[in-house]
Amino acid sequence: MRKIISLFFAIFLTLSSVQAENVTKTINSLINKDAVSVSVKDISNNKEVYSLNKKAPMIPASTLKLVTSSAALNTLGSDYEFSTKLYKSSNNDLYLKLGADPFLTSSDLKKMMTVAKEKNILEPKNIYIDSSIFDNVEWGEGWQWDDEMNPLMPKFSAYNIDENLLNIEITPSMQNMPPSIVVKPFYPLTFMNLITTDITLSKNDISIVKNLNFAQNVYDAKGEITKIENIKMPIPNLQRYFKLRLDDVINAQKIDYNKGYPNAILPTKNIYLVTSVAHKMPDAMESILKTSNNLVAETVFKLAGAKWAEEKGSISNSLGMLKFYISSLNIPTDDVKIVDGSG
């Protein structure tokens, strides 16, 4: 996949001199040309500069990020910030306004509640969460049920936090005995622990799969282990995980509150900003285009759709934004079907 992305960057750079033969050389040096379908046009005059198997249908995979991230960047702007804000009302209520920040961490929540405590906010009447920036769809069209164990494809929502991944720490015990399995930080999962400790092995051979015969959040852990192993897996319920981490930081700051976190829209009057955390667009573009991060790509795509439509983020708004952007470049889209932001 990195070769494919490198290929397209090379094509774009080559086009500055409009030398089709260099494009051909680049393609032949990087990948098997029979596996490529590409058409390169000069957008200033819509003339084709180079093509190869241009009518062959192909799944773009993560090369799609070049298109969707360009449209999103054009819509949001390079100075866009992913922000999470904490407000206080005159009624002593707190409002946590989520911005679907794909870089938000539990440490960021801790910083926010530390500031709240420093401002003597010790006994809030209620703590509300405003998650209205996105709809409730957390996966892209075509994502499969068995993708939910893939750490490269976590769910994404207004409640993005900690890369939307759990860390499962598996620690061997005595020979032929089951290891300990701990979720750090805590999240309620049940494991059917069928792993055996074998100190004679040179490496671990472990698998964790969802058990479809029992209730949700039950997993089969199988294999053999000889040393500590940490496994990343997507968070099953982002909202639940987020609220657990919010509990952690509120309790750590000794803020007196135990009433839950109902959803509510941030009021427009009688509130003031307590504190906020933010991350910048260049970090997102680097994450999308250098490491092909699906979580960041999907989040940015959905945020751009929200801004373009001036309403809640949804895939339909994102696709509308994308079509508008591509049309502005005089590129026909009649034969193109795009269903998500990451490919």
Regions found by a protein language model. Give the residues of each.
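Active/ligand-binding-proximal structured segments within catalytic/core domains
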Residues: 58-72
